[in-house]
Regions:
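Short beta-strand edge/turn micro-motifs at domain boundaries
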Residues: 133-159
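Exposed beta-sheet edge and beta->alpha loop/turn motif
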Residues: 117-141
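Short, low-complexity N-terminal intrinsically disordered segments enriched in polar/charged residues
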Residues: 2-56, 61
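A short hydrophobic beta-strand element
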Residues: 109-118
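Hydrophobic pocket/interface hotspot
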Residues: 39-42, 54, 58, 62, ...
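A solvent-exposed, acidic/Ser-Thr-rich amphipathic alpha-helical stretch
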Residues: 60-104
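A generic structural micro-feature
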Residues: 78, 95-96, 108-110, 126-132
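Short beta-strand segments enriched in hydrophobic/aromatic residues
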Residues: 58, 118-120, 152
Length: 164
C-alpha cells in the first residue's frame, strides 16, 4: 500500500509539474516580449530625439554603461535619469550617427540583447569610423529600462576621435 501511495503522489506531482511548465513558459515568453518591446521603444525614442518618451521608459535608478577609451567624454557609467540625459547631451555634441542597423535582437525574461552595425562621425575631428559592430545588453523592470550596457568597437571610435 505504501508503495502505491508513493507512486500516486509521484504521478500527481509529475502531472502538476508538466501542466505548470507551459504556463511558466508562456509567462516567460510574455515577459521576454514585453522587455524586448520596451527596449525597442526606448531605442526608437532615442533615435528620434523624443526625450519625453525616453524619460517615461527609464527607471529613475537606471544605469547606463559605456566601456572604452577614458579620454572619450561619453565613456563611463551614469546613474539616474538626470545623469543619463547629461551624458546624452555630451554624446550628441561629439558624435553623429551616420549609419545604424539593428541586425538581431532577442530577450530572455527581463534581459534583452541587440546586435547590429553602425558608423559614426566625430564632430570635433570630422573623422568617420568605418562601419562596425555594436552589442547592447539591457534589463527591464516594470516596463522601464534599468540597465543599458553598451559595447562597440571602441578602438575605431577612439581613433576617429583623436584624429586631428
Amino acid at each position: 500500500m505504501h508503495r502505491r501511495q508513493l507512486l500516486a503522489a509521484s504521478a500527481a506531482a509529475a502531472t502538476g509539474i508538466a501542466l505548470a511548465v507551459p504556463a511558466t513558459a508562456q509567462t516567460t515568453n510574455d515577459e521576454s516580449q514585453a522587455s524586448l518591446d520596451t527596449v525597442m521603444a526606448f531605442m526608437g525614442a532615442m533615435g528620434g530625439g523624443d526625450m519625453d518618451s525616453m524619460g517615461a521608459l527609464m527607471a529613475d535608478y537606471m544605469v547606463w554603461q559605456n566601456e572604452g577609451d577614458p579620454d572619450l567624454p561619453w565613456i563611463g557609467t551614469w546613474e539616474g535619469k538626470e545623469a543619463i540625459f547629461g551624458f546624452l547631451g555630451t554624446f550628441s555634441q561629439n558624435v553623429q550617427v551616420a549609419h545604424w542597423e539593428n541586425q538581431d535582437a532577442f530577450a530572455s525574461g527581463d534581459t534583452v540583447a541587440v546586435f547590429g552595425r553602425m558608423k559614426l562621425r566625430l564632430t570635433a575631428s570630422g573623422a568617420e569610423t568605418d562601419e562596425f559592430t555594436f552589442a547592447l545588453r539591457a534589463k527591464v523592470r516594470d516596463g522601464q529600462v534599468v540597465l543599458w550596457n553598451w559595447f562597440e568597437d571602441t578602438y575605431a571610435v577612439s581613433q576617429a576621435f583623436h584624429t586631428t
